[in-house]
């Protein structure tokens, strides 16, 4: 945190910048205070803490100021945050330690078990981005994958398909769907009705996984769409909030 803030100060005309830090919804008050104090010690003039799905919703262009409820699923690298928002606040939320990095791990394990081939995290991420999907494809995508043969210890190249990657990550995708269902089950019926009307918005890098929006829509029976720029929603929301702070 200290290194990051030093970089900001070096590029800014302000020696003590205002700082907004986004955190998962399941963070404790003690953890929030620790983050805030650390940021203040490193030179923050004023430090604000906001929950990431709220910031993502604002960055996605959702109007959370009205009584009508909105629902956002923010799928980051390490956590997925699911929140129902109304009147500029979070009504109910769930946070699970499963997201984009989990899909990468799933792919590594699948290829290791099926092909006895060891690949790295970077390769797994490339596979996820290029042919990753949670829907069955009639016309499969294929990709060559290079790694180390666990039987011989030598380099080896195999070809994997999009349907294989679907098989690899389906359980993790279903866990995100299950968490979203739990959120909808625990909110007031009136709020659930609002979400049926307005739909669910997906943000974060994980939102780009092919077919995930359709899977959630099919399983939950609620319209689901990916934000226009899912990768930058949190950054854009952070800027909007800071611009409106006094």
Can you say where each PLM-predicted feature lies in the sequence?
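Nucleotide/phosphate-binding catalytic cleft detector across ATP-hydrolyzing
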Residues: 1-75, 83-201, 207-246
């Amino acid at each position: 945190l200290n290194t990051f803030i030093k970089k900001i100060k070096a590029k800014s005309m302000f020696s003590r910048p205002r700082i907004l830090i986004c955190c998962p919804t399941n963070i404790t008050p003690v953890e929030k205070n620790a983050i805030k104090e650390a940021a203040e010690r490193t030179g923050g003039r004023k430090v604000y803490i906001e929950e990431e799905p709220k910031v993502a919703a604002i960055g996605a262009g959702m109007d959370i100021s009205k009584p009508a409820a909105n629902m956002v699923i923010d799928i980051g690298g390490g956590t997925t945050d699911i929140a129902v928002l109304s009147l500029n606040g979070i009504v109910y939320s769930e946070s699970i330690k499963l997201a984009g990095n989990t899909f990468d791990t799933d792919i590594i394990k699948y290829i290791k078990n099926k092909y006895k081939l060891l690949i790295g995290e970077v390769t797994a991420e490339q596979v996820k981005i290029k042919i990753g999907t949670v829907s069955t494809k009639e016309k499969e995508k294929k990709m060559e994958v290079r790694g180390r043969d666990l039987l011989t210890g030598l380099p080896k190249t195999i070809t994997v398909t999009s349907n294989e990657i679907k098989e690899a990550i389906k359980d993790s995708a279903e866990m995100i769907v299950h968490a979203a269902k739990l959120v909808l089950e625990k909110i007031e019926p009136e709020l659930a009705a609002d979400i049926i009307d307005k739909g669910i918005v997906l943000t974060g890098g994980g939102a780009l996984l092919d077919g995930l929006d359709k899977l959630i829509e099919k399983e939950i029976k609620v319209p689901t769409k990916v934000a226009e720029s899912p990768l930058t929603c949190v950054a854009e929301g952070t800027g909007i909030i800071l611009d409106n702070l006094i």
